[in-house]
């Protein structure tokens, strides 16, 4: 059904055509073959990242198909550019409606945009938005403010798909003269290189263990990590 030779990257598998009708039992089996030398250290074996079963309408948001960029930042507002890929797996064209709502770090609604969507049969359509955010709170190493882009795809009164994407509003730049700048301020990267394991917990990625790892790195003066 699906073969993936690299354990560090995410991948997806469409199992629609293999599923039994509603009411019947479906069994998902994963076989791991770990043969030969694959690393200079023990990299673990088996399923050591999260696995999700995703159910969508034939007309849906593309997995990993949302991009949020900060185009411009002033004292008064920030301008966001958001692109969303919509897939249509039907044999006929489809019409839908998309609404993007921006939620501030404080949980307040700070922006809403809406567009109609028309996707060809078995096609993909990229929908582009430009949204202003007044008095934006910028993301930085010391103040990691995170906004959310809530994307809702619907047809009539039926919700086809929805997703919430966390993101930070910030500007970055590089130059030979001034180096790396975050939000127009010079920032020296103090990086660490870590393997993906969590010591005695093994290679499995546990949410709290990953957060603790970052907390320890930051407490020791690091502001960049290579995993």
Model-derived regions: residue spans:
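Short glycine/proline/serine/threonine-rich loop/turn segments at secondary-structure transition edges
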Residues: 19-25, 39, 93, 133-148
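Hydrophobic beta-strand positions in extracellular immunoglobulin-like domains
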Residues: 32, 53, 84-86, 102, ...
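Short acidic/polar inter-strand loop motif in beta-rich domains
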Residues: 33-39, 154-160, 184
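Accessory beta-strand-rich segments of carbohydrate-active enzymes
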Residues: 1-64, 89-90, 105, 224-227
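Exposed aromatic-hydrophobic patches
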Residues: 10-17, 124-132
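Active-site-adjacent substrate/metal-binding segments within catalytic domains
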Residues: 1-5, 58-71, 81, 136, ...
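Conserved, mostly hydrophobic/aromatic
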Residues: 51, 84, 147, 184
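Beta-strand-rich binding/interaction modules
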Residues: 77-118, 125-129
């Amino acid at each position: 059904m699906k073969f993936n030779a690299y354990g560090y990257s995410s991948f997806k598998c469409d199992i629609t055509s293999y599923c039994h009708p509603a009411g019947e039992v479906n069994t998902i089996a994963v076989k791991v073959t770990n043969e030969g030398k694959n690393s200079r250290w023990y990299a673990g074996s088996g399923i050591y990242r999260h696995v999700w079963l995703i159910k969508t309408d034939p007309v849906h948001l593309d997995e990993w198909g949302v991009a949020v960029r900060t185009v411009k930042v002033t004292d008064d507002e920030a301008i966001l550019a958001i692109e969303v890929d919509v897939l249509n797996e039907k044999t006929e064209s489809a019409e839908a409606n998309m609404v993007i709502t921006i939620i501030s770090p404080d949980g307040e609604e700070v922006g809403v945009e809406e567009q109609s969507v028309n996707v060809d049969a078995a096609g993909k359509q990229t929908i582009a938005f430009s949204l202003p955010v007044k008095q934006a709170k910028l993301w930085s190493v010391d103040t990691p403010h995170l906004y959310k882009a809530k994307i809702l795809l619907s047809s009539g009164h039926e919700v086809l798909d929805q997703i919430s994407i966390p993101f930070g509003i910030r500007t970055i730049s590089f130059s030979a003269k001034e180096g790396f700048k975050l939000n127009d301020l010079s920032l020296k990267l103090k990086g660490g290189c870590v393997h993906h394991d969590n010591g005695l917990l093994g290679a499995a990625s546990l949410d709290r263990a990953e957060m603790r790892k970052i907390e320890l790195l930051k407490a020791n003066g690091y502001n960049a990590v290579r995993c």
